[in-house]
């Protein structure tokens, strides 16, 4: 019996002979221009005195003043910045007035308890120019000064970019707000759902349906270097992996396999895809080169089910799920093939592994004691920690800096799970700050994009 993500299990269980376990910045028309620091305050070359260590689970959030950037659009921009920063649990956004064209009153800001402050304004009609300055209240230094110009329709992206700048200057590593999440939008009753490939901003805004819902669609995965998504579709009643080009809207079959192909993930270079394909009574893992479409088999399951492969960030290894030892567990092997080493030894059944972009953790789903758990472990299998639990928690995906996971949470209430619901939430790698992403449909199978270029 093999463990695959819950949505894959629903689709594939009827096809397998044995039932699966359920389970700064210039792009996109946006221009960034540096703003000089005021003469009395030199620009700092690194994070200010408010720098903290993000790995500390209960670190006190940084108090930061983010005023309105003006009426109308300016107020909306500051609202998104505030939501982004507060959502991390690492910042405490405070109201206040910081004049955009002069040095802040640091004494007043210190008395308010602020450690950092933002000054900004948004002006324009058909296009918007947003100026922002970030100040370290404790040192009196300007940490950042930038002006952004874009069409009015891009105002949310400006806000996310400003939040990323604040995050990076205060914490010393890049933020993840100017990103997107691909997912499966779900509508209709539980056993007759319409599934669509969909895309949204990481905060749930700008929902966009990419496919029409004619066929069952599952497991989207972002290419790390281009606007391309791999996913599984039952188009024409043949379950196969497809590639979707976001710029053109075109989709194409990744490759022909004798059986079902599923569970795709891109290599770190974006030049190949690792996936599972059925063979006889089991499934094996293959790597498909995108340029030549050549296929290379890297496992020989001998009737077991090897699935859910994921590359390490350097592309040298693959973590995957297999029932070759009798129960679904996690294994690591060289990306070129060879022997596999088991890394999961806790109680229960393991699946849905995904490697952190930092290389330090592997996230997973574990089934045991009558429920689902979402956790992380070191790549050698040590240091296992459970982050959250529930009726079903599955499909973890890391944000680009590796500090936050998005995942699918399914719930059931009433007799027979009559109140079944599926949605996407986020949680940080310390196990704190779990938050739902509010969108207009049911949702599953999240896949976090790289940073927008």
Swiss-Prot record:
Keyword Lyase found: no
Compartments (UniProt record): Periplasm
Main location: periplasm
Family matches, as Gene3D superfamilies: TolB, C-terminal domain, TolB, N-terminal domain
CC terms in the record's Gene Ontology section: periplasmic space
SUPFAM superfamilies xref list: TolB, N-terminal domain, Tricorn protease N-terminal domain
Claim: DNA-binding is one of the keywords in the record: no
GO BP terms in the entry: cell division; protein import
Keyword annotations from UniProtKB, A to Z: Cell cycle, Cell division, Periplasm, Signal
Signal peptide: 1-39
Family under the similarity heading: Belongs to the TolB family.
HAMAP family (alphabetical): TolB
Biological role stated in the UniProt entry: Part of the Tol-Pal system, which plays a role in outer membrane invagination during cell division and is important for maintaining outer membrane integrity.
Subunit and interaction comment: The Tol-Pal system is composed of five core proteins: the inner membrane proteins TolA, TolQ and TolR, the periplasmic protein TolB and the outer membrane protein Pal. They form a network linking the inner and outer membranes and the peptidoglycan layer.
Protein name stated in the entry: Tol-Pal system protein TolB
Protein source organism: Gluconobacter oxydans (strain 621H)
């Amino acid at each position: 019996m093999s463990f695959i993500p819950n949505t894959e299990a629903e689709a594939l269980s009827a096809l397998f002979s044995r039932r699966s376990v359920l389970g700064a910045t210039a792009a996109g028309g946006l221009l960034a221009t540096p703003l000089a620091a005021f003469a009395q305050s030199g620009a700092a070359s690194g994070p200010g005195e408010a720098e903290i260590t993000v790995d500390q689970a209960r670190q006190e959030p940084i108090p930061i003043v983010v005023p309105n950037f003006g009426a109308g659009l300016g107020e909306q921009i500051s609202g998104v910045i505030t939501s982004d920063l507060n959502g991390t649990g690492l910042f405490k956004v405070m109201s206040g007035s910081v004049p955009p064209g002069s040095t802040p009153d640091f004494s007043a800001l210190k008395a308010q308890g602020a450690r950092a402050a933002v000054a900004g304004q948004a002006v324009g009609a058909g296009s918007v120019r947003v100026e922002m300055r970030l100040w370290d209240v404790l040192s009196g230094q300007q940490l950042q000064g930038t002006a952004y110009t874009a069409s009015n329709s891009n105002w949310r992206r400006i806000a996310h970019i400003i939040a990323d700048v604040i995050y990076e200057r205060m914490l010393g590593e890049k933020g993840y707000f100017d990103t997107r999440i691909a997912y499966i939008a779900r509508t209709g009753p539980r056993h007759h759902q319409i599934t669509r490939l969909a895309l949204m901003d990481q905060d749930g805004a700008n929902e966009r349906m990419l496919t029409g819902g004619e066929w069952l669609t599952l497991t989207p995965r972002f290419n790390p270097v281009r606007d391309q998504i791999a996913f599984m579709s039952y188009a024409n009643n043949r379950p196969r992996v497809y590639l979707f080009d976001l710029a053109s809207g075109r989709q194409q079959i990744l490759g022909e396999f004798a059986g079902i192909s599923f569970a795709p993930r891109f290599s770190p270079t974006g030049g190949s895809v690792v996936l599972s394909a059925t063979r006889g009574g089991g499934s094996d893992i293959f790597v498909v080169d995108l340029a030549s479409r050549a296929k290379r088999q890297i496992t020989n399951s001998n009737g077991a089910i090897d699935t859910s492969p994921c590359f390490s960030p350097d592309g040298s290894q693959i973590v995957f799920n297999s029932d070759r030892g009798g129960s679904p567990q996690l294994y690591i092997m060289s990306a070129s093939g060879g022997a596999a080493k088991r890394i999961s030894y806790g109680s229960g059944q393991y699946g849905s592994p995904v490697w952190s972009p930092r290389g330090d953790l592997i996230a997973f789903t574990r089934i045991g004691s009558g429920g689902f758990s979402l956790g992380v472990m070191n790549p050698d299998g040590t240091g296992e920690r459970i982050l959250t639990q529930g009726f079903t928690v599955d499909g973890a995906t890391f944000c680009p800096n590796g500090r936050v996971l998005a995942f699918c949470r399914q719930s059931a209430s009433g007799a027979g799970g009559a109140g079944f619901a599926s949605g996407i939430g986020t949680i940080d790698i310390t196990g704190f700050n779990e938050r739902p992403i509010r969108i207009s449909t049911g949702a599953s199978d999240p896949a976090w994009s790289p940073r927008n270029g």
